[in-house]
Amino acid sequence: MLKESPFFSVITILGTALAICMIMVMVIVFEIQNKGFKPELNRDRTLYVKDVAITHKNEEDGGMNYSLVGGRVAKECFFTLKTPEAVSMQLMRMQTLVTSTDQTRRMKCDQIRTDEGFWKIFDFEFLAGKPFLRSDVESNIKKAVISRRLALRIFGLADESVIGQTIFVARRPYVVGGIVEDVSPLANRAYAQIWIPYAQSDVDRLINEETLEGLIGSYRVLILARSSGDFNKIKTEVEQNVARFNNSLQELKIDLMKQPDTQMESRLRLWSNVVPDVPRM
């Protein structure tokens, strides 16, 4: 066939090769988005809550608000769960400026504010030091875990000698408590160059302010199951907690819109009010 019609034969071969390449790319993208790799090794047993819907108990009052998870919701609906291995909440990633104490070395980097549960859910490679603890979160201790790249940029080293040194994060002093290997941006939920504790006092303050009964917030919740076989049990426990929580509210109620989600469901949940049509695996 190649001799009889070389032009069409070449087109056919190239078309077949292109189709195979496209399929391979799609498979690779799927693997990156859904399969576990360090530090997100536990994707297959992690559940996620991105946001909540807030409505009036009296439907005649109308209106619906969508928000990231509030501290009160996280505290009463998720941190009280008995089945999971770990629960964590984190503020959305943001950019910040990190500088040395003499201000001569600096780096603009991505920052995540989170808690001690974060380090149980994700499998970071620590080069030196250790993650911050629950006591650091509760006491508002200014301690940071930084990436290898950030350590090299600020100190020129990424070893034990950096632990206990001071850096400035958005002009506030933090003590370096740990150094981890650099994280790929493809690990979307774990990726940053600096991780610091959120202040429990800030969470409590926002709960007590006029934020729709403390329901509005800026957090996302991660739940690590002991195995994927516990997913249904965890979801049932969450539903029970939400029902109990709604009964305690005066005028409002929350709806998790079928959350918590699996890794794939969370990726496909593009809009707050649209539940992804993905069968449970």
Spans of features found by a protein language model:
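Short aromatic/basic micro-patch
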Residues: 68, 108, 112-113, 144-145
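Generic structural signal for small/hydrophobic residues in well-ordered secondary structure
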Residues: 2-5, 12, 33, 49-51, ...
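Membrane-embedded glycan transfer/ligation machinery
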Residues: 11, 46, 112, 116
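The feature marks short, hydrophobic/small-residue-biased sequence motifs that occur predominantly
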Residues: 91, 101-133, 137-138
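Short, strongly hydrophobic transmembrane alpha-helices
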Residues: 5-35
